[in-house]
Amino acid sequence: MPRERDSTDHSNMKEEGGSDLSVRSRKRKANVAVFLQDPDEEIAKIDKTVKSEDSSQPWDDNSACVDPCSFIPTPNKEEDNELEYPRTAFQPRKIRPPRASPLPVLNWGNREEVWRIMLNKEKTYLRDEHFLQRHPLLQARMRAVLLDWLMEVCEVYKLHRETFYLAQDFFDRYMASQHNIIKTLLQLIGISALFIASKLEEIYPPKLHQFAYVTDGACSGDEILTMELMMMKALKWRLSPLTIVSWLNVYVQVAYVNDTGEVLMPQYPQQVFVQIAELLDLCVLDVGCLEFPYGVLAASALYHFSSLELMQKVSGYQWCDIEKCVKWMVPFAMVIREMGSSKLKHFRGVPMEDSHNIQTHTNSLDLLDKAQAKKAILSEQNRISPPPSVVLTPPPSSKKQSSEQETE
């Protein structure tokens, strides 16, 4: 009997071991599937799960009762394209549908689905234009100096424009989540944001000691690593926004798309892209840019170098959507036009077809001072003599002649 019991136990152990192996293999496959998912989609699923768990709490007698009929869907009900508020004494408001997709037919995906994901990015990654109120010891000029320095670092290490704009987004969103940051920490936060962005975007990012070197001893490698973890926790690991330059790349690509509809490789003139990107490089130094979504900023910059019709075609925006941003961007566009378009820079080791994507640095702070001076002059002129609300048209020629005869 002991031998039979031992053999039985041994067989049970084998069965349990086999089940463990199958469970482990399934876990490995599940981990691979999770790894291949979009990080934003995974975070959204986690948030949805947490909300569902909160909704499944025990019944609370003190909670307000809700009409159960509101949870019963009406069968065979046609959905309206525009949702309307219930009619009241006030004028009913309508929710505007999302702007139409300007993307061409894609051979690698559904253009409507791609456009929907792009629009959801703007809703997910929000910024706070008043984040400096959380930091009484900081000024808007300090942010401009830091971003100008990050542009210079990007040019030295031949980093892409997308890398810089990712770092700018990480910095602004991190500062909006903190309080009472002192001036001496700004450089550490900025270089840590660029360190994170370079690992996400660059194929061969600079080493950690290279980022510490450009700070001239102000930040050590260990401090950058510590700040990196603090920033990612504060950002809740949301590290894949659609930046300003990403929107610009889409708009210009759609504007110059060929008959084949191929959009995987750039089809636009590099000089055109660089000229508009220089305007955005200047605008992003002003903290006022945080008032507008990234897509609106890119569309407004494109408008200043093209036309209203082209902007509407490639972005889906209407004039009312970008009017405020276009007017805000006027002094910056005036400075860029006075400076003239800079020549396309070529970098050693960078292919010619990718040279326009490398972040460049100019005397951005001087240009920012000129733009802010023009902004003050324009605001003063508008205060003294505000522009007419309607377009004035001359009278017909027949009335002109009759009025002239009467005066004689």
Swiss-Prot record:
Phosphorylation of both Thr-393 by GSK3 and Ser-397 by CDK2 creates a high affinity degron recognized by FBXW7, and accelerates degradation via the ubiquitin proteasome pathway. Phosphorylation at Thr-74 creates a low affinity degron also recognized by FBXW7. GO terms for cellular component: cyclin E1-CDK2 complex; cyclin-dependent protein kinase holoenzyme complex; nucleoplasm; nucleus. Residues 1-17 have a biased composition (Basic and acidic residues). The lineage of its organism: Eukaryota, Metazoa, Chordata, Craniata, Vertebrata. Interacts with CDK2 protein kinase to form a serine/threonine kinase holoenzyme complex. The cyclin subunit imparts substrate specificity to the complex. Part of a complex consisting of UHRF2, CDK2 and CCNE1. Interacts directly with UHRF2; the interaction ubiquitinates CCNE1 and appears to occur independently of CCNE1 phosphorylation. Found in a complex with CDK2, CABLES1 and CCNA1. Interacts with INCA1. Found in adult spleen, and to a lesser extent in adult testis and brain. Belongs to the cyclin family. Cyclin E subfamily. The modification Phosphothreonine is found at T74, T393. SUPFAM superfamilies: Cyclin-like (SSF47954). GO terms for molecular function: cyclin-dependent protein serine/threonine kinase regulator activity; kinase activity; protein kinase binding. The modification Phosphoserine is found at S101, S385, S397. The keyword Protein transport does not apply. Its main location: nucleus. GO terms for biological process: cell division; chromosome organization involved in meiotic cell cycle; DNA replication initiation; G1/S transition of mitotic cell cycle; homologous chromosome pairing at meiosis; negative regulation of transcription by RNA polymerase II; positive regulation of mesenchymal stem cell proliferation; regulation of cell cycle. Pfam families: Cyclin_C, Cyclin_N. Residues 1-27, 379-408 are annotated as: Disordered. Keywords: Cell cycle, Cell division, Cyclin, Nucleus, Phosphoprotein, Ubl conjugation. The gene is Ccne1. InterPro entries: Cyclin, Cyclin-like_dom, Cyclin-like_sf, Cyclin_C-dom, Cyclin_N, Cyclins_cyclin-box. It is found in: Nucleus. This is G1/S-specific cyclin-E1.
